[in-house]
Amino acid sequence: MKQPVPSAHFDGFPREFTDFLFSLRFRNTIDLLPENKIKYKALITEPLTLLSNDLTQTALSISDTLNVKPSKCVSTMYSDMRFSRATPLKEYMYIRFREPSCEHDILGLYFDMGCEGYSYGIRIYNQTSAGMESIREGVLAKRRDFTRELEKLSSHGIMIVGDKYARDHYPDITDNNSIKVLLNMRSFHMCWDKAIDETVFNRALLDEITCAYRGLNNIFLLLKQALLQN
């Protein structure tokens, strides 16, 4: 009796991927595209798709409306030829679990990686000033909830990164730095940034991102609720 073939799971990126991505800085040409495509598929596209598949249930446990189709979530190997005609392949990779399509302020979980480092967390795609104002209103309306989650995440090393106002727009808030930082952002994302290390070459990367996504559950839902008012 023929045994069923077990489904594949993510077990790390091949060690060669860093050297390959670095080499694309110098060898990413149309002439070398046939050779590079074969390597790209094996070293990046295939393991990245497995990683996305293995993160899917965690993403859906945070928000069951996230788009988790690999064709929508996993970066393709090809650069946008409108802007990168001479360099046909991407020199980085990403996974995007985003809320259903709309024109702006699209909340999502992400993972990015290049040859030197990787990052994961929460992004808001096509962020607008109106969307940011909705978030500020949500923060102020649920100040205690946001404070609890931001302080918890800060203790675990998350960063709020983005474009800040030149001056403090909330000088009256003197007892809550985590809230003040978020309120004074024009745009932002929440992330953990890591250097490439042994983690990316085995299943530990999946475990690390899974744990981080679960820790983002409450802040993700708070941001989602705030943006629904936009």
What do these predicted regions represent?
Residues 70-73, 79-82, 86-96, 106, ...:
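Soluble extramembrane domains of integral membrane proteins
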Residues 37-44, 124, 134-139, 201, ...:
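Short histidine-centered catalytic/ligand-binding loop motif
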Residues 114-174:
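Compact, glycine/acidic-enriched structural inserts
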Residues 35, 115-120, 184-192:
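Glycine-rich, often proline-containing surface loops adjacent to acidic residues and nearby aromatics
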Residues 80-141:
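Aromatic- and glycine-enriched beta-alpha-beta binding-site module
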Residues 1-30, 49-52, 140, 161-230:
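Long, solvent-exposed, polar/charged low-complexity segments
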Residues 55-66, 154, 222-230:
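Surface-exposed helix-capping loop/turn segments at secondary-structure junctions
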Residues 22-74:
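Active-site acidic/histidine clusters and adjacent loop/turn architecture
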